[in-house]
Amino acid sequence: MAELQMLLEEEIPSGKRALIESYQNLTRVADYCENNYIQATDKRKALEETKAYTTQSLASVAYQINALANNVLQLLDIQASQLRRMESSINHISQTVDIHKEKVARREIGILTTNKNTSRTHKIIAPANMERPVRYIRKPIDYTVLDDVGHGVKWLKAKHGNNQPARTGTLSRTNPPTQKPPSPPVSGRGTLGRNTPYKTLEPVKPPTVPNDYMTSPARLGSQHSPGRTASLNQRPRTHSGSSGGSGSRENSGSSSIGIPIAVPTPSPPTAGPAAPGAAPGSQYGTMTRQISRHNSTTSSTSSGGYRRTPSVAAQFSAQPHVNGGPLYSQNSISVAPPPPPMPQLTPQIPLTGFVARVQENIADSPTPPPPPPPDDIPMFDDSPPPPPPPPVDYEDEEAAVVQYSDPYADGDPAWAPKNYIEKVVAIYDYTKDKDDELSFKEGAIIYVIKKNDDGWFEGVCNRVTGLFPGNYVESIMHYTD
Protein backbone atom coordinates (compact mmCIF):
# COMPACT_ATOMS: atom_id res chain seq x y z
CA MET A 1 0.00 0.00 0.00
CA ALA A 2 2.88 2.37 0.78
CA GLU A 3 4.47 1.60 -2.56
CA LEU A 4 1.26 2.45 -4.36
CA GLN A 5 0.97 5.72 -2.45
CA MET A 6 4.59 6.62 -3.25
CA LEU A 7 4.00 6.00 -6.95
CA LEU A 8 0.84 8.08 -7.01
CA GLU A 9 2.19 11.01 -4.97
CA GLU A 10 5.89 11.25 -5.86
CA GLU A 11 7.31 9.28 -8.78
CA ILE A 12 4.59 9.71 -11.40
CA PRO A 13 4.12 13.51 -10.81
CA SER A 14 7.92 14.04 -10.88
CA GLY A 15 8.10 12.17 -14.18
CA LYS A 16 5.42 14.41 -15.63
CA ARG A 17 7.29 17.56 -14.51
CA ALA A 18 10.54 16.23 -16.04
CA LEU A 19 8.81 15.69 -19.37
CA ILE A 20 7.39 19.23 -19.36
CA GLU A 21 10.85 20.67 -18.59
CA SER A 22 12.39 18.59 -21.38
CA TYR A 23 9.78 19.96 -23.75
CA GLN A 24 10.70 23.52 -22.87
CA ASN A 25 14.44 22.79 -23.06
CA LEU A 26 14.02 21.26 -26.50
CA THR A 27 12.36 24.46 -27.73
CA ARG A 28 15.21 26.61 -26.43
CA VAL A 29 17.88 24.27 -27.85
CA ALA A 30 16.24 24.37 -31.25
CA ASP A 31 16.23 28.17 -31.31
CA TYR A 32 19.88 28.30 -30.24
CA CYS A 33 21.00 25.81 -32.89
CA GLU A 34 19.15 27.69 -35.61
CA ASN A 35 20.70 31.05 -34.73
CA ASN A 36 24.14 29.53 -34.28
CA TYR A 37 24.05 27.86 -37.69
CA ILE A 38 23.01 31.09 -39.42
CA GLN A 39 25.57 33.30 -37.69
CA ALA A 40 28.51 30.88 -37.65
CA THR A 41 31.21 31.22 -40.29
CA ASP A 42 32.13 27.55 -40.08
CA LYS A 43 28.95 25.81 -41.11
CA ARG A 44 30.30 22.31 -40.65
CA LYS A 45 31.25 22.92 -37.04
CA ALA A 46 27.88 24.45 -36.34
CA LEU A 47 26.17 21.44 -37.92
CA GLU A 48 28.12 19.00 -35.77
CA GLU A 49 27.25 20.95 -32.64
CA THR A 50 23.59 20.90 -33.63
CA LYS A 51 23.71 17.10 -34.08
CA ALA A 52 25.24 16.65 -30.64
CA TYR A 53 22.53 18.74 -28.96
CA THR A 54 19.83 16.88 -30.83
CA THR A 55 21.12 13.43 -29.81
CA GLN A 56 21.48 14.46 -26.17
CA SER A 57 18.04 15.98 -26.03
CA LEU A 58 16.33 12.97 -27.61
CA ALA A 59 18.13 10.56 -25.28
CA SER A 60 17.09 12.56 -22.26
CA VAL A 61 13.47 12.66 -23.35
CA ALA A 62 13.41 8.90 -24.14
CA TYR A 63 14.85 8.05 -20.70
CA GLN A 64 12.25 10.16 -18.96
CA ILE A 65 9.42 8.57 -20.96
CA ASN A 66 10.71 5.07 -20.14
CA ALA A 67 10.89 5.84 -16.42
CA LEU A 68 7.39 7.25 -16.39
CA ALA A 69 6.02 4.24 -18.32
CA ASN A 70 7.63 1.75 -15.89
CA ASN A 71 6.09 3.57 -12.95
CA VAL A 72 2.67 3.46 -14.57
CA LEU A 73 2.96 -0.31 -15.31
CA GLN A 74 4.06 -1.01 -11.74
CA LEU A 75 1.07 0.97 -10.52
CA LEU A 76 -1.26 -1.12 -12.66
CA ASP A 77 0.24 -4.41 -11.37
CA ILE A 78 -0.20 -3.34 -7.76
CA GLN A 79 -3.79 -2.35 -8.38
CA ALA A 80 -4.51 -5.71 -10.14
CA SER A 81 -3.14 -7.69 -7.19
CA GLN A 82 -5.24 -5.61 -4.83
CA LEU A 83 -8.29 -6.33 -6.93
CA ARG A 84 -7.59 -10.09 -6.76
CA ARG A 85 -7.27 -9.94 -2.99
CA MET A 86 -10.50 -8.01 -2.74
CA GLU A 87 -12.25 -10.56 -4.97
CA SER A 88 -11.00 -13.43 -2.81
CA SER A 89 -12.18 -11.74 0.34
CA ILE A 90 -15.55 -11.03 -1.21
CA ASN A 91 -15.91 -14.71 -2.22
CA HIS A 92 -15.00 -15.77 1.31
CA ILE A 93 -17.58 -13.41 2.73
CA SER A 94 -20.23 -14.74 0.34
CA GLN A 95 -19.46 -18.34 1.32
CA THR A 96 -19.65 -17.42 4.98
CA VAL A 97 -23.02 -15.80 4.40
CA ASP A 98 -24.27 -18.89 2.55
CA ILE A 99 -23.14 -21.15 5.39
CA HIS A 100 -24.87 -18.95 7.90
CA LYS A 101 -28.04 -18.99 5.86
CA GLU A 102 -27.95 -22.81 5.68
CA LYS A 103 -27.51 -23.05 9.43
CA VAL A 104 -30.42 -20.73 10.00
CA ALA A 105 -32.55 -22.70 7.56
CA ARG A 106 -31.72 -25.99 9.29
CA ARG A 107 -32.52 -24.45 12.64
CA GLU A 108 -35.87 -23.24 11.36
CA ILE A 109 -36.63 -26.65 9.90
CA GLY A 110 -35.69 -28.28 13.20
CA ILE A 111 -38.14 -26.05 15.03
CA LEU A 112 -40.99 -27.38 12.90
CA THR A 113 -40.19 -31.04 13.73
CA THR A 114 -41.04 -33.00 16.88
CA ASN A 115 -38.59 -34.83 19.08
CA LYS A 116 -38.60 -38.62 18.92
CA ASN A 117 -37.93 -40.42 22.15
CA THR A 118 -36.17 -43.73 21.43
CA SER A 119 -35.88 -46.35 24.12
CA ARG A 120 -32.72 -48.40 24.01
CA THR A 121 -33.41 -52.11 24.07
CA HIS A 122 -31.51 -55.26 23.24
CA LYS A 123 -31.20 -56.19 19.63
CA ILE A 124 -32.16 -59.83 20.23
CA ILE A 125 -35.48 -60.31 21.95
CA ALA A 126 -36.70 -63.73 22.97
CA PRO A 127 -40.13 -64.59 21.60
CA ALA A 128 -42.95 -64.43 24.05
CA ASN A 129 -44.56 -67.67 22.90
CA MET A 130 -42.16 -70.51 22.15
CA GLU A 131 -43.02 -72.48 19.04
CA ARG A 132 -43.56 -76.16 19.53
CA PRO A 133 -41.12 -78.32 17.58
CA VAL A 134 -42.64 -80.20 14.70
CA ARG A 135 -42.43 -83.95 15.11
CA TYR A 136 -40.47 -85.69 12.40
CA ILE A 137 -42.55 -88.06 10.34
CA ARG A 138 -40.75 -90.46 8.06
CA LYS A 139 -42.22 -90.61 4.59
CA PRO A 140 -41.47 -93.62 2.41
CA ILE A 141 -39.43 -92.90 -0.71
CA ASP A 142 -41.39 -93.24 -3.91
CA TYR A 143 -39.01 -94.58 -6.53
CA THR A 144 -41.59 -94.28 -9.32
CA VAL A 145 -41.85 -90.47 -9.26
CA LEU A 146 -39.31 -89.91 -12.03
CA ASP A 147 -40.21 -92.90 -14.19
CA ASP A 148 -42.20 -90.81 -16.69
CA VAL A 149 -39.54 -88.10 -16.95
CA GLY A 150 -36.81 -88.11 -19.58
CA HIS A 151 -36.23 -89.32 -23.09
CA GLY A 152 -36.79 -92.98 -22.30
CA VAL A 153 -40.55 -92.56 -21.82
CA LYS A 154 -41.37 -92.99 -25.49
CA TRP A 155 -39.26 -96.12 -25.77
CA LEU A 156 -40.79 -97.67 -22.67
CA LYS A 157 -44.35 -96.93 -23.80
CA ALA A 158 -43.71 -98.17 -27.31
CA LYS A 159 -42.16 -101.40 -26.08
CA HIS A 160 -44.36 -102.24 -23.11
CA GLY A 161 -47.49 -100.34 -23.96
CA ASN A 162 -49.07 -97.34 -22.33
CA ASN A 163 -51.13 -99.40 -19.87
CA GLN A 164 -48.20 -101.22 -18.31
CA PRO A 165 -46.65 -99.64 -15.26
CA ALA A 166 -43.17 -98.26 -15.84
CA ARG A 167 -40.16 -99.99 -14.37
CA THR A 168 -39.15 -98.91 -10.92
CA GLY A 169 -35.42 -98.39 -10.64
CA THR A 170 -32.59 -97.43 -12.89
CA LEU A 171 -29.80 -99.81 -11.87
CA SER A 172 -29.92 -103.54 -12.53
CA ARG A 173 -28.25 -105.75 -9.97
CA THR A 174 -26.14 -108.50 -11.51
CA ASN A 175 -25.60 -111.93 -10.11
CA PRO A 176 -22.64 -112.34 -7.77
CA PRO A 177 -19.55 -113.85 -9.36
CA THR A 178 -19.01 -117.55 -8.98
CA GLN A 179 -15.39 -117.14 -7.96
CA LYS A 180 -13.78 -114.71 -5.58
CA PRO A 181 -10.81 -112.63 -6.70
CA PRO A 182 -7.39 -113.96 -5.82
CA SER A 183 -6.21 -112.79 -2.46
CA PRO A 184 -2.93 -113.30 -0.65
CA PRO A 185 -2.89 -116.14 1.85
CA VAL A 186 -2.19 -113.81 4.80
CA SER A 187 -4.56 -110.84 5.07
CA GLY A 188 -3.62 -109.68 8.56
CA ARG A 189 -0.75 -107.58 7.27
CA GLY A 190 -2.99 -105.16 5.37
CA THR A 191 -4.69 -102.08 6.69
CA LEU A 192 -8.10 -103.80 6.70
CA GLY A 193 -8.73 -106.75 8.97
CA ARG A 194 -11.61 -108.95 10.03
CA ASN A 195 -12.33 -106.90 13.12
CA THR A 196 -12.81 -103.72 11.08
CA PRO A 197 -16.33 -102.63 10.05
CA TYR A 198 -15.44 -103.23 6.39
CA LYS A 199 -15.59 -106.95 5.69
CA THR A 200 -12.95 -108.44 3.43
CA LEU A 201 -13.21 -111.33 1.03
CA GLU A 202 -11.96 -114.72 1.97
CA PRO A 203 -8.53 -115.55 0.59
CA VAL A 204 -8.49 -118.07 -2.22
CA LYS A 205 -5.61 -120.26 -3.18
CA PRO A 206 -4.02 -119.17 -6.42
CA PRO A 207 -4.65 -121.51 -9.34
CA THR A 208 -2.09 -124.06 -10.31
CA VAL A 209 -0.18 -124.14 -13.54
CA PRO A 210 -1.91 -126.05 -16.36
CA ASN A 211 -0.10 -129.00 -17.82
CA ASP A 212 -0.28 -127.47 -21.31
CA TYR A 213 2.10 -124.71 -20.34
CA MET A 214 4.70 -126.71 -18.47
CA THR A 215 8.28 -126.18 -19.51
CA SER A 216 9.37 -128.36 -22.39
CA PRO A 217 12.72 -130.16 -22.17
CA ALA A 218 13.60 -128.98 -25.71
CA ARG A 219 13.85 -125.33 -24.63
CA LEU A 220 15.44 -125.62 -21.25
CA GLY A 221 18.97 -125.17 -22.44
CA SER A 222 18.50 -121.68 -23.85
CA GLN A 223 16.54 -120.21 -20.91
CA HIS A 224 18.71 -120.71 -17.85
CA SER A 225 20.52 -117.38 -17.83
CA PRO A 226 19.39 -114.92 -15.15
CA GLY A 227 19.07 -112.06 -17.65
CA ARG A 228 16.54 -113.93 -19.78
CA THR A 229 14.69 -115.29 -16.77
CA ALA A 230 14.26 -111.80 -15.33
CA SER A 231 12.70 -110.39 -18.50
CA LEU A 232 9.07 -111.32 -17.96
CA ASN A 233 6.34 -111.56 -20.51
CA GLN A 234 4.50 -108.30 -19.81
CA ARG A 235 0.90 -109.07 -20.68
CA PRO A 236 -1.61 -106.29 -21.45
CA ARG A 237 -4.30 -105.68 -18.92
CA THR A 238 -7.15 -106.44 -21.27
CA HIS A 239 -6.28 -110.15 -21.49
CA SER A 240 -7.00 -112.44 -18.59
CA GLY A 241 -5.58 -115.64 -20.07
CA SER A 242 -2.48 -117.19 -18.54
CA SER A 243 0.86 -116.69 -20.26
CA GLY A 244 3.60 -119.29 -20.05
CA GLY A 245 3.88 -120.95 -16.69
CA SER A 246 1.71 -118.46 -14.78
CA GLY A 247 -1.69 -119.66 -16.05
CA SER A 248 -3.70 -117.49 -13.63
CA ARG A 249 -5.97 -114.48 -13.82
CA GLU A 250 -3.65 -112.55 -11.56
CA ASN A 251 -1.75 -111.24 -14.57
CA SER A 252 -4.81 -109.25 -15.70
CA GLY A 253 -6.86 -108.35 -12.66
CA SER A 254 -4.23 -107.55 -10.07
CA SER A 255 -1.98 -105.62 -12.44
CA SER A 256 -4.29 -102.61 -12.29
CA ILE A 257 -3.99 -102.49 -8.49
CA GLY A 258 -0.26 -103.07 -8.17
CA ILE A 259 -0.51 -105.58 -5.23
CA PRO A 260 2.16 -108.26 -5.26
CA ILE A 261 0.55 -111.70 -5.37
CA ALA A 262 2.57 -114.85 -5.13
CA VAL A 263 2.24 -117.22 -8.08
CA PRO A 264 3.37 -120.83 -7.69
CA THR A 265 5.61 -121.89 -10.52
CA PRO A 266 7.30 -125.17 -11.29
CA SER A 267 10.82 -125.65 -10.08
CA PRO A 268 13.55 -125.23 -12.67
CA PRO A 269 14.41 -128.44 -14.52
CA THR A 270 17.72 -130.08 -13.92
CA ALA A 271 18.06 -131.51 -17.42
CA GLY A 272 20.44 -129.81 -19.82
CA PRO A 273 23.69 -128.01 -19.05
CA ALA A 274 23.30 -124.90 -16.94
CA ALA A 275 25.00 -121.69 -17.98
CA PRO A 276 27.70 -120.35 -15.68
CA GLY A 277 26.27 -118.02 -13.06
CA ALA A 278 22.72 -119.40 -13.43
CA ALA A 279 20.18 -118.44 -10.78
CA PRO A 280 19.53 -121.08 -8.08
CA GLY A 281 16.24 -122.81 -7.74
CA SER A 282 15.05 -120.45 -5.02
CA GLN A 283 14.84 -117.64 -7.52
CA TYR A 284 12.14 -119.49 -9.43
CA GLY A 285 9.94 -120.19 -6.41
CA THR A 286 7.72 -117.10 -6.18
CA MET A 287 7.97 -113.83 -8.02
CA THR A 288 5.69 -110.84 -7.48
CA ARG A 289 4.21 -108.82 -10.28
CA GLN A 290 5.99 -105.64 -9.29
CA ILE A 291 9.41 -107.27 -9.43
CA SER A 292 8.63 -108.95 -12.73
CA ARG A 293 7.47 -105.69 -14.22
CA HIS A 294 10.62 -103.97 -12.99
CA ASN A 295 12.85 -106.68 -14.40
CA SER A 296 11.11 -106.66 -17.75
CA THR A 297 11.50 -102.92 -18.00
CA THR A 298 15.15 -102.92 -17.06
CA SER A 299 16.04 -105.83 -19.30
CA SER A 300 14.30 -104.37 -22.32
CA THR A 301 15.89 -100.98 -21.86
CA SER A 302 19.37 -102.25 -21.07
CA SER A 303 19.65 -104.53 -24.06
CA GLY A 304 19.46 -101.64 -26.58
CA GLY A 305 19.89 -97.91 -26.50
CA TYR A 306 16.33 -97.24 -27.68
CA ARG A 307 12.94 -98.35 -26.35
CA ARG A 308 10.04 -98.55 -28.72
CA THR A 309 6.98 -96.83 -27.32
CA PRO A 310 3.85 -99.01 -27.17
CA SER A 311 1.25 -98.17 -29.81
CA VAL A 312 -2.36 -99.16 -30.35
CA ALA A 313 -1.31 -102.30 -32.22
CA ALA A 314 1.87 -103.11 -30.30
CA GLN A 315 3.35 -106.57 -30.78
CA PHE A 316 4.79 -108.63 -27.99
CA SER A 317 6.83 -111.39 -29.52
CA ALA A 318 9.52 -113.84 -28.60
CA GLN A 319 10.03 -113.10 -24.90
CA PRO A 320 11.21 -115.86 -22.59
CA HIS A 321 8.94 -116.91 -19.78
CA VAL A 322 9.66 -116.22 -16.15
CA ASN A 323 10.42 -119.81 -15.19
CA GLY A 324 11.97 -121.07 -18.39
CA GLY A 325 8.71 -121.97 -20.09
CA PRO A 326 8.05 -121.95 -23.82
CA LEU A 327 8.10 -118.78 -25.92
CA TYR A 328 4.90 -117.18 -27.14
CA SER A 329 4.07 -114.37 -29.54
CA GLN A 330 0.95 -112.33 -29.04
CA ASN A 331 -0.48 -109.32 -30.92
CA SER A 332 -2.78 -107.30 -28.71
CA ILE A 333 -3.85 -103.79 -27.90
CA SER A 334 -1.52 -102.61 -25.15
CA VAL A 335 -1.41 -99.68 -22.84
CA ALA A 336 1.78 -97.89 -21.89
CA PRO A 337 3.00 -99.51 -18.62
CA PRO A 338 3.36 -97.29 -15.55
CA PRO A 339 6.86 -96.47 -14.34
CA PRO A 340 8.50 -99.45 -12.63
CA PRO A 341 8.04 -99.38 -8.84
CA MET A 342 10.85 -100.04 -6.42
CA PRO A 343 11.50 -103.79 -6.02
CA GLN A 344 10.42 -104.05 -2.42
CA LEU A 345 7.85 -106.17 -0.64
CA THR A 346 4.69 -104.27 0.32
CA PRO A 347 1.90 -105.37 2.66
CA GLN A 348 -0.49 -107.65 0.86
CA ILE A 349 -3.99 -106.13 1.03
CA PRO A 350 -7.00 -108.20 -0.03
CA LEU A 351 -9.17 -106.74 -2.76
CA THR A 352 -12.62 -105.66 -1.67
CA GLY A 353 -15.69 -103.99 -3.08
CA PHE A 354 -15.89 -102.77 -6.63
CA VAL A 355 -12.27 -103.54 -7.50
CA ALA A 356 -12.70 -107.21 -6.61
CA ARG A 357 -15.90 -107.49 -8.69
CA VAL A 358 -14.24 -105.84 -11.67
CA GLN A 359 -11.29 -108.18 -11.34
CA GLU A 360 -13.55 -111.23 -11.30
CA ASN A 361 -15.53 -109.98 -14.29
CA ILE A 362 -12.32 -109.47 -16.24
CA ALA A 363 -10.90 -112.78 -15.14
CA ASP A 364 -14.07 -114.73 -15.98
CA SER A 365 -13.67 -113.98 -19.70
CA PRO A 366 -10.79 -116.28 -20.67
CA THR A 367 -8.91 -115.95 -23.91
CA PRO A 368 -7.47 -118.86 -25.86
CA PRO A 369 -3.76 -119.45 -25.28
CA PRO A 370 -1.57 -118.04 -28.03
CA PRO A 371 0.12 -120.53 -30.35
CA PRO A 372 3.84 -121.08 -29.81
CA PRO A 373 6.08 -119.34 -32.36
CA PRO A 374 8.62 -121.18 -34.50
CA ASP A 375 12.00 -121.96 -33.01
CA ASP A 376 13.92 -119.57 -35.23
CA ILE A 377 12.37 -116.41 -33.71
CA PRO A 378 15.00 -114.42 -31.81
CA MET A 379 14.81 -114.20 -28.04
CA PHE A 380 14.28 -110.42 -27.88
CA ASP A 381 12.06 -108.25 -30.07
CA ASP A 382 14.28 -105.18 -30.02
CA SER A 383 17.76 -105.82 -31.34
CA PRO A 384 20.49 -103.54 -29.95
CA PRO A 385 21.49 -100.65 -32.22
CA PRO A 386 24.77 -100.90 -34.09
CA PRO A 387 27.79 -99.78 -32.07
CA PRO A 388 29.06 -96.25 -32.67
CA PRO A 389 31.93 -95.84 -35.11
CA PRO A 390 35.38 -96.16 -33.58
CA PRO A 391 37.03 -92.91 -32.58
CA VAL A 392 39.47 -91.34 -34.97
CA ASP A 393 43.03 -92.27 -34.18
CA TYR A 394 44.88 -89.02 -33.54
CA GLU A 395 48.19 -90.64 -32.74
CA ASP A 396 49.37 -89.78 -36.21
CA GLU A 397 49.79 -86.01 -36.39
CA GLU A 398 49.07 -85.90 -40.09
CA ALA A 399 45.48 -87.10 -39.50
CA ALA A 400 44.63 -83.97 -37.51
CA VAL A 401 46.24 -81.48 -39.89
CA VAL A 402 44.09 -79.71 -42.47
CA GLN A 403 45.68 -80.16 -45.86
CA TYR A 404 46.12 -76.75 -47.44
CA SER A 405 48.57 -74.86 -49.56
CA ASP A 406 49.53 -71.34 -48.51
CA PRO A 407 50.24 -69.36 -51.70
CA TYR A 408 51.11 -66.35 -49.54
CA ALA A 409 53.81 -67.95 -47.44
CA ASP A 410 56.57 -65.79 -48.92
CA GLY A 411 54.64 -62.51 -48.80
CA ASP A 412 51.17 -61.09 -48.29
CA PRO A 413 49.05 -60.44 -51.40
CA ALA A 414 48.09 -57.01 -52.61
CA TRP A 415 44.58 -57.26 -51.17
CA ALA A 416 45.84 -58.16 -47.69
CA PRO A 417 45.34 -55.43 -45.07
CA LYS A 418 48.39 -53.55 -43.91
CA ASN A 419 47.62 -54.09 -40.24
CA TYR A 420 46.10 -57.41 -39.20
CA ILE A 421 46.08 -59.46 -36.00
CA GLU A 422 46.93 -62.87 -37.37
CA LYS A 423 46.75 -65.06 -40.41
CA VAL A 424 44.40 -68.05 -40.12
CA VAL A 425 43.38 -71.03 -42.23
CA ALA A 426 39.81 -72.35 -42.51
CA ILE A 427 39.32 -75.88 -41.16
CA TYR A 428 35.65 -76.13 -42.25
CA ASP A 429 33.50 -74.87 -45.07
CA TYR A 430 31.25 -71.96 -44.18
CA THR A 431 28.42 -70.32 -46.13
CA LYS A 432 27.32 -66.88 -45.06
CA ASP A 433 23.85 -66.31 -43.63
CA LYS A 434 23.93 -62.50 -43.81
CA ASP A 435 25.34 -59.93 -46.18
CA ASP A 436 28.11 -58.83 -43.82
CA GLU A 437 29.60 -62.34 -43.44
CA LEU A 438 32.25 -64.26 -45.37
CA SER A 439 31.89 -67.51 -47.29
CA PHE A 440 34.95 -69.73 -47.63
CA LYS A 441 36.05 -73.30 -48.23
CA GLU A 442 38.30 -75.51 -46.20
CA GLY A 443 41.93 -74.43 -46.46
CA ALA A 444 41.18 -70.78 -47.34
CA ILE A 445 43.61 -68.15 -46.03
CA ILE A 446 41.99 -65.32 -44.03
CA TYR A 447 43.59 -62.22 -42.52
CA VAL A 448 41.99 -61.38 -39.16
CA ILE A 449 41.68 -57.66 -38.47
CA LYS A 450 39.38 -57.75 -35.43
CA LYS A 451 38.24 -60.27 -32.80
CA ASN A 452 34.87 -59.69 -31.14
CA ASP A 453 33.94 -60.83 -27.65
CA ASP A 454 31.06 -63.00 -28.94
CA GLY A 455 33.43 -65.36 -30.79
CA TRP A 456 33.06 -63.79 -34.25
CA PHE A 457 36.10 -62.50 -36.13
CA GLU A 458 36.33 -59.85 -38.82
CA GLY A 459 38.75 -60.56 -41.60
CA VAL A 460 39.65 -60.30 -45.27
CA CYS A 461 39.59 -63.21 -47.70
CA ASN A 462 40.06 -62.83 -51.46
CA ARG A 463 39.43 -59.06 -51.40
CA VAL A 464 36.19 -59.50 -49.41
CA THR A 465 35.83 -58.18 -45.86
CA GLY A 466 33.27 -59.68 -43.50
CA LEU A 467 32.50 -61.56 -40.31
CA PHE A 468 33.01 -65.29 -39.74
CA PRO A 469 32.88 -67.62 -36.71
CA GLY A 470 36.17 -67.96 -34.91
CA ASN A 471 35.78 -71.69 -34.28
CA TYR A 472 35.85 -72.39 -38.03
CA VAL A 473 39.49 -71.36 -38.38
CA GLU A 474 42.81 -72.10 -36.77
CA SER A 475 45.88 -69.97 -36.51
CA ILE A 476 48.28 -70.70 -39.32
CA MET A 477 51.10 -70.95 -36.81
CA HIS A 478 49.76 -74.37 -35.76
CA TYR A 479 50.54 -75.83 -39.17
CA THR A 480 53.85 -74.24 -40.06
CA ASP A 481 55.92 -76.98 -38.40
Swiss-Prot record:
Q: Which residues form the t-SNARE coiled-coil homology domain?
A: 45-107
Compositional bias, Pro residues, is annotated for 366-376, 383-392
Q: Where is the composition biased (Polar residues)?
A: 161-175, 222-235
The cross-references to Pfam families, in alphabetical order and at most eight, read: Abi_HHR, SH3_1
Question: Could you say which tissues express the protein in this record?
Answer: Widely expressed with highest levels in bone marrow, spleen, brain, testes, and embryonic brain. In adult brain prominently expressed in the neocortex, hippocampus and dentate gyrus.
Phosphoserine sites (modified residues): 183, 187, 216, 222, 225, 292, 296, 439
Q: Which GO terms describe its molecular function?
A: protein tyrosine kinase activator activity; SH3 domain binding; signaling adaptor activity
What PROSITE patterns is this protein classified in? SH3, T_SNARE
Q: According to the UniProt entry, which residues carry Phosphotyrosine? A: 53, 213, 428
Which superkingdom is the protein from?
A: Eukaryota
Which GO biological-process labels does this protein carry? dendrite morphogenesis; lamellipodium morphogenesis; megakaryocyte development; somitogenesis
Enumerate the InterPro entries for this protein.
ABI, Abi1_SH3, Abl-interactor_HHR_dom, SH3-like_dom_sf, SH3_domain, T_SNARE_dom
Q: Residue limits of the SH3 domain? A: 419-478
Chain segments carrying region Disordered: 158-285, 318-348, 361-392
Q: Where is this region: Required for binding to WASF1?
A: 18-79
**Phosphothreonine, modified sites:** 174, 178, 215, 480
Q: Show the ranges annotated as biased composition (Low complexity).
A: 248-258, 272-282
Matching SUPFAM superfamilies, A to Z? SH3-domain
Predominant place of localization: cytoplasm
Q: Which family does it belong to?
A: Belongs to the ABI family.
Domain notes for this protein: The t-SNARE coiled-coil homology domain is necessary and sufficient for interaction with STX1A.
Q: Could you tell me which PANTHER family the record lists for this protein?
A: ABL INTERACTOR 1, ABL INTERACTOR FAMILY MEMBER
Task: Please describe what this protein does.
Answer: May act in negative regulation of cell growth and transformation by interacting with nonreceptor tyrosine kinases ABL1 and/or ABL2. In vitro, at least isoform 2 and isoform 4 suppress the transforming activity of Abelson murine leukemia virus (v-Abl) after overexpression in fibroblasts. May play a role in regulation EGF-induced Erk pathway activation. Involved in cytoskeletal reorganization and EGFR signaling. Together with EPS8 participates in transduction of signals from Ras to Rac.
Q: How does it assemble?
A: Interacts with ENAH, Abelson murine leukemia virus V-ABL, ABL1, STX1A, SNAP25, VAMP2, and through its N-terminus with WASF1. Part of a complex consisting of ABI1, STX1A and SNAP25. Part of a complex consisting of ABI1, EPS8 and SOS1. Interacts with EPS8, SOS1, SOS2, GRB2, SPTA1, and the first SH3 domain of NCK1. Component of the WAVE2 complex composed of ABI1, CYFIP1/SRA1, NCKAP1/NAP1 (NCKAP1l/HEM1 in hematopoietic cells) and WASF2/WAVE2. Interacts (via SH3 domain) with SHANK2 and SHANK3, but not SHANK1; the interaction is direct.
Q: What is this protein called?
A: Abl interactor 1
Q: Which organism is it from?
A: Mus musculus (Mouse)
